[in-house]
Amino acid sequence: MNKSILLFFVTMASFSSFALAQSKNDVIHLIDGPKEVQVIEVGFNTIKYSFPNENTVYSISKHQVSKIEFASGREEVFNSPFKPVNGLDDFQNVYISYNPEDVVGLDPRGELFSKATGVTTLSSINNVKNRAMDKLKAEASMLGANVVLVGNVFQRGNQYGGENQAGNSTQTTFSGTAYSTQKLDLEKAKSMLLDQSFHHYQTHKLNRNSWSPERAIATVYDKDRKPLMFEFDKVIEKEDGVYVSASKIPTKTKELKVIHADNEMVVVMERNDKIITNYILISKDNKYFKNLASRVIL
């Protein structure tokens, strides 16, 4: 009798353990946080999964996944090529993709276009193509994007002219859409923008018809020969992000979009037709002021 009862409990315990193991799901770690799912397939470029008790199968780029914790206890880690981009200085970190699955679920930042043309019919085709690509990355970075999905590419080789016909130098154009994996914490950004004063340190500008982006020091000193500080007149939250206005920034645009904000630096952006401009604003916590304190301004 005692053996029968013991066998019953052992059987029930085994069944419960099996059921628990069966009910446990996989955990997929995405850019926006972990999700409990059932992983169906880990392919070369994509991962297919479904949600518990659902039949719909979803597909996502492996670039958007940092890790999978399988129900079995095994873990698989992925190295994403997506890197942080806070403005023009990080333009080389912009990831170029030709695969639409790479940008599913990412935050769109705007349409892009870049063009580069050789100076003469002896210009290097590769050099011109690389310059067009750098301009594409630069424009994306100035929109606060770190991923570009290329839509169209046009490339023309050098065309040598004749006695009655002018030649054409090589040209490359790219068009695409900018995306970001980095989402601005709206409440945190608004609080920080309202609580601090800033100095307009640099201005970065890109004209699509120009050779490359321009960088200019914008520092203005007050009557005591100290960098001029200012506060924002308004901080506004909209559907697509946070906007600010400040009379101390030399722009005719009433509202500038915030593309990056931390304790040391804020980058705000305006875009007019073919020209995009970033205003680099720094706070008292920036290392620039620490270095300034160690020297004397004449």
What is each stretch, according to the model?
Residues 2, 23, 87, 99, ...:
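Serine/threonine-rich low-complexity intrinsically disordered regions
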Residues 85-89, 97, 101-105, 186-193, ...:
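Extracytoplasmic low-complexity/disordered linkers and repeat tracts associated with LysM-containing
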Residues 6-8, 13, 29, 132, ...:
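Residues at the start of alpha-helices and the adjacent loop-to-helix junctions
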Residues 21-123, 127-142, 170, 247-298:
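Compositionally biased alpha-helical segments
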